[in-house]
UniProtKB/Swiss-Prot annotation:
It catalyses: (S)-2,3,4,5-tetrahydrodipicolinate + succinyl-CoA + H2O = (S)-2-succinylamino-6-oxoheptanedioate + CoA. Coiled coil: none annotated. Its EC number is 2.3.1.117. Keywords: Acyltransferase, Amino-acid biosynthesis, Cytoplasm, Diaminopimelate biosynthesis, Lysine biosynthesis, Repeat, Transferase. This is 2,3,4,5-tetrahydropyridine-2,6-dicarboxylate N-succinyltransferase. Homotrimer. The gene is dapD. GO terms for cellular component: cytoplasm.
Length: 51
């Protein structure tokens, strides 16, 4: 999971330079995997508030 996070965060830092035509395979696969994990409920996005 940490590797996926690192790839996504690195891509986010380079977001102005990334297009669908030039995105590298590692980034594309990481994004697709995270989307699949979110869709299946294996991952979720949440913000911890007071707790």
């Amino acid at each position: 999971m940490q590797q996926l996070q690192n790839v996504i965060e690195s891509a986010f830092e380079r977001r102005a330079d990334i297009t669908p035509a030039n995105v590298d395979t590692v980034t594309r696969e990481a994004v697709n995997q995270v989307i699949s994990l979110l869709d299946s409920g294996a991952l979720r996005v949440a913000k911890k508030i007071d707790g």
